[in-house]
Design a protein with these regions (language model features):
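Structural recognition of the beta-strand scaffold that forms the well-ordered cores
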Residues: 20, 29-34, 71-74, 82-83, ...
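Solvent-exposed loop/turn segments at secondary-structure junctions
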Residues: 2-6, 25-28, 37-40, 78-82, ...
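Short, solvent-exposed loop/beta-turn-alpha elements that line the ligand-binding surface or hinge
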Residues: 11-26, 31-62, 104-128, 142-146, ...
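Bilobed periplasmic-binding protein-like "clamshell/Venus-flytrap" ligand-binding domains
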Residues: 82-86, 136-158, 259-310
């Protein structure tokens, strides 16, 4: 934990044992919304949905509003959350894309994050813009019959060091922006189980808003779509349930169009197998479309934790993707 870092570094008997773990450059963290807040039976999985106390009907109206999602996109300051786990400096960990930089490059050596429409995506944090989208969302959601403040259930795993602190500073920062002048949202931090967290919370759809990560399995941008892409009728990887929300009629109108356009963009990109540059540009366009329509919100690279060890981690087995680096 960062709480004891200073004391260990100041102690001559322990300072030489402290180091940061090797950076995981194939992973990225992001925020995502639950587009399926109700129970659903898949052929190979069931979701329980959001508990009634968090008003899933009200949430369904809110998440269907692009103005609501964009209010979050522009209200979130990643630096606040990153400062919890990166007290020595966080600028190198901030991301404005889902795919990390230096993940792969096209035939001309152009980094994937600089390909296609992704090259135009920049940091979004802007309080004034966030409040403009909030005001538009208030008008839109009031007409749709929503009530305020919108409850936003935000769970964390107590077994993960500092995740609870990240949630607390996130709540303070985002509510400080979005509730300035109007009681817009109530971010409700909930503690999930330390064991079986994924099955009990994320894969069960028992949340409304969440932060989590995805790790690349191989060095091609197709691997980065799977938290969000779903084939028709399939559960996918049980992150945001974008397509299922549309198929169940929860997500409608403009947002449904965004979701299905993204699915189509991914399918067309996957079909490009002979032209690497065209393939990368197509995937980059799809990722940019996902972000700019606030279907996901980028956060950061993983901040390597400080550990006490006598091993030289740089002498161990390494690969930027997959599980190879877990072998000592």
């Amino acid at each position: 934990s960062s709480d004891i870092l200073d004391s260990w570094l100041a102690d001559d008997t322990t300072k030489d044992m402290v180091s940061m773990e090797r950076p995981e450059t194939g992973k990225s963290y992001f925020y995502f919304f639950n587009f399926l807040p109700y129970a659903h039976q898949f052929p190979n999985w069931n979701t329980t949905g959001v508990d009634a106390q968090y008003q899933p009907d009200n949430w369904a109206k809110a998440v269907n509003s692009t103005n609501f999602r964009k209010a979050f996109l522009y209200a979130i300051n990643p630096a606040v959350t990153l400062a919890v786990t990166a007290p020595e400096g966080y600028e190198n960990y901030k991301l404005h894309t889902i795919t990390p930089p230096s993940f792969c490059a096209n035939s001309k050596g152009v980094d994937y994050t600089e390909c296609g429409a992704l090259a135009k995506v920049t940091d979004h944090f802007n309080e004034a813009t966030a409040k403009q989208y909030r005001d538009a969302a208030v008008q839109e959601l009031t007409a749709a019959g929503a009530t305020f403040p919108i409850k936003v259930q935000y769970p964390y795993n107590p077994a993960v060091v500092d995740w609870d602190k990240q949630c607390q500073v996130f709540k303070q920062q985002v509510e400080g922006v979005l509730n300035d002048g109007f009681d817009f949202v109530e971010i409700i931090i909930t503690q999930g189980p330390s064991d079986n967290f994924l099955n009990a919370v994320r894969r069960a759809g028992a949340y409304e808003f969440m932060s989590y990560y995805w790790g690349a399995d191989y060095s091609d941008p197709e691997t980065e779509v799977y938290p969000f892409y779903q084939e028709a009728g399939d559960r996918g990887t049980c992150y945001a349930f974008l397509r299922t929300g549309v198929e169940d009629g929860i997500i409608t109108g403009e947002t449904a169009d965004y979701v299905m356009t993204y699915m189509d963009m991914v399918e067309k990109a996957k079909a490009i197998t002979a032209d690497l540059d065209a393939r990368y540009a197509a995937f980059a366009d799809a990722e940019a479309y996902l972000i700019e329509n606030a279907l996901v919100i980028p956060l950061s690279l993983p901040v390597p934790p400080y550990i006490a060890t006598r091993l030289n981690l740089w002498e161990g087995q390494y690969a930027p993707t997959g599980f190879s680096s877990n072998r000592l």
